[in-house]
Amino acid sequence: MDMDSAHLDSSLLTLAFRLIKAAQTAAPSVLADLLAEGAPAWFQDDDLGWSCLHYAAERKEPECLEVLLQGGAVWNAVDKWGRTAGEICLSLGDEEGWSIIRNEGIRSEMLHHALSGTSSPDATNNIVLRAEDKTSAGDNLVFLKSKLTWDVGKDGKERVLDADGNGVMMGWEEPLMVEHVKRLTEEHPKAELGAEGMSILNVGFGLGIVDRLFQECDPKPSHHTIIEAHPQVLEYIHKKGVHLLPNVRILQGRWQDWLLDGEKVGDVLSGTPDGMGFDAIFVDTFAEGYEDLKAFFEVIPDILNADNGRFSFWNGLGATNPTIYAVSSSLAELHLEDVGLQVEWHDVLIPESMREEVWKGVRRRYWDLPGYRLPIAKMSLI
């Protein structure tokens, strides 16, 4: 919503600046009157890139925030430093104000999906959480044609970069993947010593960290399917001999090719016990947005074992901004509930050193938060 003031006629521009000024000191009724006159609530000033919502957040007056949001203020508009009004609230210790903005984000995103009438990953609607991006980092089809590079970062850990220098998979994520595998397998009856082992589905190989961790479990997986689409990653898989490991099966292609095709779903399930679904499913794709993740949610009931199955995903959408990250996580929880899954969240601390050193030599930083919200979803008990 960062629109140039040149697009406004003089009368609207005057109203926009009046609203910006009023948001700093005026009563909520004055803000409501200006909005009723047509003042553009999305407008951001040139000095700070602040909207009326940013200025109102600085006042710590919740009613002003509510009036502005009802009048069209944009909950996730960012200033010149990438901060939403929610971060202004957080910096001032205003939990109530932050909750108002977060809840509006959840409401507007849920409304977006309800009105879009589709969850297809090919839909033209772009979720507000993620702007349109036709680079290899923002478009999965572009990414699948891009050249990848494997190297070692300044932190001494292996990483995969795309042709634009964006991190596809980076070694710093391994402690988080350890937690994912731990939460997906702990106390599962098939993961106990002497048991037959779990059936695993992983979508998106990357550096193979999560697949290696699953293979290190005792007992090892009784079945382990990996869906991967990038040609170079598939070459890497064969170079490492992953496809030769016992009970491992590689399905080449996008997950949409396999799981949105009714006939192929049966092939995917063919290796699970009695074809009744996987015991653990993990998804971590690159250059896909929330629409794609939501579409994946909707196939989970068809491929997850209903009794003890667990599902998790790389929870990285909006992870450079705490307010957007909170909205994204809440939205995912609500949409998982829509398809019959209950989510438990596990908070994992990310050390400051890990958040700084790893980004040297990487074009686009995709993480900038002190904590990670790890989701574990299970089918709801009726």
UniProtKB/Swiss-Prot annotation:
Keyword Transferase: yes
Binding site for S-adenosyl-L-methionine: 143, 177, 205-210, 228-230, 255-256, 284
Alphabetically ordered keywords of this record: ANK repeat, Cytoplasm, Methyltransferase, Nucleus, Repeat, S-adenosyl-L-methionine, Transferase
Residue ranges constituting the RMT2 domain according to the UniProt record: 134-382
Domain of life: Eukaryota
Enzyme class per UniProt: transferase
Placement of ANK repeats on the sequence: 22-46, 48-80
E.C. numbers: 2.1.1.-
Location in or out of the cell: Cytoplasm; Nucleus
Recorded family membership: Belongs to the class I-like SAM-binding methyltransferase superfamily. RMT2 methyltransferase family.
Function: S-adenosyl-L-methionine-dependent protein-arginine N-methyltransferase that methylates the delta-nitrogen atom of arginine residues to form N5-methylarginine (type IV) in target proteins. Monomethylates ribosomal protein L12.
Protein name as annotated: Protein arginine N-methyltransferase 2
Name of the gene encoding the protein in the UniProt record: RMT2
